[in-house]
Amino acid sequence: MKGGDIRASGDLFTLPAGAVNLGVGADLRNYHYKQTPSADAVNGVIYNFSANPQYDLSRDNYGVFAETLIPVIKGLEANASLRYDTISKIKDSVNNRDFGKTESAATYKLSARYQVSNRLLLRGSYGTGFKAPNMLDIAQPLVSNGVTAANYDCPFPGDGSGSPPCKPGKAQYTQLSGGNENLKPEKSKQGTIGFRFEPTSNFSVAADYWQVKLRDAVSGVSADQAFGNPTQYASLFTTYQQPAEQQPFYAFEALSTNIGKAINKGIDWEFAGRTNIEGLGRLTTSLSGTYLIESSYTRPGTSDDFTDSMGHYGENSAVSFRNIFTAQTSLQTGALTNTLTFKYRSGYLDKRQTVRDLSTGKNTTIQLTVPEYFTFDYQGIYKFNKAAEVRLGVINLFNAKPPLTLRDSSGHQVGYDPRYASPMLRTVYVSGSYNF
């Protein structure tokens, strides 16, 4: 990545409550991504291995912006910002072609904060957003990315007149990853409103309600969705022959796509306390988290068919947790600081699965309730002086095991979900630093 920035700021004029400040600027970025397979990979020296395709991608981003801070009255500040971005199409100098198209958008943000008193602050904001997909999401050539995590029936078994490229019975099919040239940028509207209250110098409470609405949200069609409705997602199927296979079979293209709309709403909250304990030191405690009110999205290919993953394993092969919070207590005694951290995620309904009941020998459909998951972490820091310190920490202090889940979206990582719980159990680490 190469780039440059230019910025300038200064006071425009003065109001009774203070000076009105204006800042302007511009930035330029050139992103470059190159892949060159080795000669051995290209020439087949490596047994049973397909060389990755060669490419050399580049893209330019330009942006200009302006921001102003206005002291409306004593204690009340307003902020307004405007930005314009242009993101060029992607050039592949190796294959001598372009991907996507040049995209431009203007976005803005309005915010205000009102210091009602020394103890109470009110705040709020509203704005728009623009986010272009990364280069690989648009222009990466199709490559083999292993196989589907679960076994599926043939997506297109045919009408009996020929021999479709199906695998026998239920099987894992090759999964391909690559770019989607038709991928569009995400656009969003978001707003927040909240407060911070400090009744004493040793205690504070804060809460912010937030809402984000996405248009042309970038996500993907899961293998479950595609194999569950292959007719609707026929464009995501092709044929592919692995080096070890005698013939090509159907393969699933796991590409990023614009799923349509997404709506997320929640409340971020925090309690914090501080006190000095004679003979022990400074004790600081905080409790913060997010309460998710809504997390919905449209099914790929639709504009108003909403579904969600709130408190359950959703069609997008993910979970939106109703409650996530962290509690932390630190005691600083001279040069030594001890910190204990508690991390929590609420439980959820697992993916519905068909399993064999060993007591009856028959298949049955079940859906587990995955319990809440929490861990304790410890960290001790000793500062020898301003330059040197040593850290000793224990992650997952009480060796909590990941909760059982029957989801099958992570290949051979079965029985737990590595996105939400670590299989490493208790982990001890030691580190040090010296600044000079």
Give the positions of each predicted feature.
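Outer-membrane beta-barrel transmembrane domain signature of Gram-negative proteins
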Residues: 1-79, 301-330
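Short loop/turn motifs that connect adjacent beta-strands in outer-membrane beta-barrel proteins
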Residues: 13-21, 72-76, 119, 201-202, ...
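Outer-membrane beta-barrel signature, preferentially recognizing the C-terminal barrel domain
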Residues: 57-59, 132-206, 247, 252-267, ...
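Gram-negative outer-membrane beta-barrel transporters
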Residues: 204-352
